[in-house]
A protein has these predicted regions:
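Ligand-binding pockets and gating/stacking loops
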Residues: 1-440
Length: 440
């Protein structure tokens, strides 16, 4: 993951740190971020053109339920199936006529008119790999957030891409992928405390604020002298990149966005005293401040979704741990975004890396199942109350309108204002896939 102040070996285009220093001149600020910003701006992706037309600015909160949530105990119950398939829980009506979900989601049942469900997501591996869910491809390590970062850039001083929740399991290297380290997210492992440790946004221990500003003054003098010798457009923009790097290090807006103690205790309690709930609150603060893409991984500390049944991981965990935290946190996020006028411009996505087996095993749990899983989308212009596709009677496979990972990816990109038909820069990441028509 990208950390301000650490050496970065490669950027989006694969050039080395030495080459970056040659392009950027003296590294008197003591940071490599300005070089990364500069290289990202001045070198377009090989063979890819400029955007076709202006886009509406949107953000995304992408919630990854690592471990593989069961479709039966969430958004696709099967009340008419045999007991060993439907499980011990019933279904409940929602505020969308004809749409029912599991009774373990009473708060979300009252908010489904703001959500769209995909009940026919298919073509996943059935294993613990995040690639299809986070990239739309089995082979890619380039996440949605990295692509959005590369195509849209930063808003003000805020980092464009933030990951909450620690490393993704069993998928080493996922992040910037082919776009390089400059498109990796800022990683915040645990936002549960009242204030996050923001080492990423701090000066090195041996660099005082006074020394930092002295370096900036020296750099400005060097840049002015160099500009007189070379008036090219790239040289003229150097001050901008160093200013952006310095702003990230010193901006109170950036630090405040990561400071949960700024929130009312009553609102923090509404989100829930869990890592998941507090991460959702931080995600809202980030998109409100200008972050384009927040990728939020479900925390193992809140209980794993991998409910095989052994080691006390059976279906009862859904009722006792997982669903109460999920239901409380997600429903509060949707309310909070709506109340702040952010829901229309913020896409919320919920998905795991797989579903669970139709039949409950002899341990009282469900095993891996890649042939069918659900996804929930809300906000960002998504038509609420929509249900895309359906599963068969046993929840084993799509019965209607199967949605593949690349089609899911195309839907996300289109909703975020990236024209999947006209913008040639997106094609390397989705191929010929089209968005789900009912959702865009």
């Amino acid at each position: 993951m990208f950390n301000v102040g650490q050496a970065i070996s490669r950027n989006c285009q694969g050039i080395t740190r030495r080459e970056l220093l040659q392009v950027g001149g003296l590294s008197v600020l003591g940071i490599s971020l300005a070089n990364l910003l500069r290289s990202e701006e001045t070198r377009p992706l090989t063979g890819l053109g400029s955007p076709a037309r202006p886009r509406t600015e949107k953000s995304c909160i992408f919630i990854f339920l690592e471990g593989g949530p069961s479709q039966f105990e969430t958004f696709d119950p099967k009340p008419s199936a045999p007991m060993d398939i439907r499980g011990p829980y019933g279904n409940c009506a929602t505020n969308v006529p004809g749409t029912q979900i599991c009774e373990l989601l009473p708060m979300m049942a009252d908010r489904m008119d703001r959500c769209a469900l995909i009940r026919s997501l298919t073509g996943f591996t059935g294993g613990h790999t995040a690639r299809p869910a986070l990239t739309g491809s089995f082979n890619s390590l380039t996440t949605y957030g990295a692509v959005v970062t590369r195509l849209k850039g930063a808003i003000g001083d805020m980092p464009p891409y933030v990951h909450l929740g620690g490393k993704i399991f069993n998928t080493p290297g996922i992040g910037g992928g082919i776009l390089g380290s400059a498109c990796d997210p800022i990683e915040i492992r645990d936002p549960f405390g009242r204030q996050v440790n923001l080492q990423q946004f701090s000066l090195s221990a041996d660099v005082t604020p006074q020394r930092f500003h002295q370096r900036r003054e020296l750099l400005n003098a060097v840049d002015q002298a160099r500009a007189k010798a070379n008036t090219g457009a790239a040289i003229e923009r150097m001050d901008t990149f160093h200013q952006r790097a310095a702003n990230i290090l010193t901006s109170p807006i950036v630090r405040n966005a990561f400071d949960l103690s700024q929130e009312r205790e009553t609102l923090r309690e509404r989100y829930g005293a869990s890592h998941f709930g507090q991460s959702l609150l931080m995600a809202r603060r980030l998109v409100e401040a200008g972050t384009r893409f927040v990728q939020l991984k479900w925390y193992d500390w809140d209980g794993p979704w991998d409910i095989h049944g052994f080691n006390s991981t059976g279906i009862e965990r859904m009722e006792e741990e997982l669903m109460p935290r999920f239901d409380q946190g997600l429903s509060t996020l949707l309310d909070d975004l709506r109340d702040r006028g952010l829901l229309a411009s913020t896409l919320v996505v919920v998905v795991g890396e797989m579903g669970r087996t139709p039949r409950i095993n002899h341990w009282g749990g469900r095993d891996h199942w890649g042939n069918l899983l659900f996804a929930l989308l809300a906000g960002g212009g998504i038509p609420g109350g929509t249900v895309v596709g359906s599963s068969d009677a046993h929840g084993a496979a799509p019965a209607t309108f199967p949605v593949q990972p690349d089609e899911f990816a195309a839907t996300i990109y289109r909703t975020l204002g990236i024209d999947t038909n006209l913008d040639p820069r997106i094609r390397p990441f989705i191929g010929s896939a089209a968005p789900v028509a009912a959702l865009v």
